[in-house]
Amino acid sequence: MAVNLYDYANQLEQALRESEEYKAIKEAFANVKANEESKKLFDEFRETQINFQQKQMQGEEIAEEDLQKAQEQAQAIEKDENISALMNAEQKMSQVFQEINQIIVKPLDEIYAD
């Protein structure tokens, strides 16, 4: 009987949705969206990040003033309790993803370990 990895991936997706880490992100993001100032800061910072990524992908240099603006945004975000809670929740979920990834690639690691 052949194993369908996609069935397992779909089960993993459902398990992630039921996890405490996912629920924490969902709640934290709802709190960010519910607070006008938090939402504005969050959206501005995301836009800055996207612009930086696009410039890096195109090989463009990021201007000093853009870096300064990003640093100021990052400082404002650190002071925002809603966004800080969201970032903490995201870090916890990222740790879960890293651990899951280690489990997933273990068979390949074993092949190349010899």
Swiss-Prot record:
Gene3D superfamilies assigned to the protein according to its UniProt record, in alphabetical order: YheA/YmcA-like (1.20.1500.10)
Pfam families: Com_YlbF
Record SUPFAM superfamilies: YheA/YmcA-like
Family (UniProt): Belongs to the UPF0342 family.
Family annotation (NCBIfam families): PRK13676.1-5 (NF010212)
UniProt-recorded name of the protein: UPF0342 protein SAOUHSC_01977
Organism: Staphylococcus aureus (strain NCTC 8325 / PS 47)
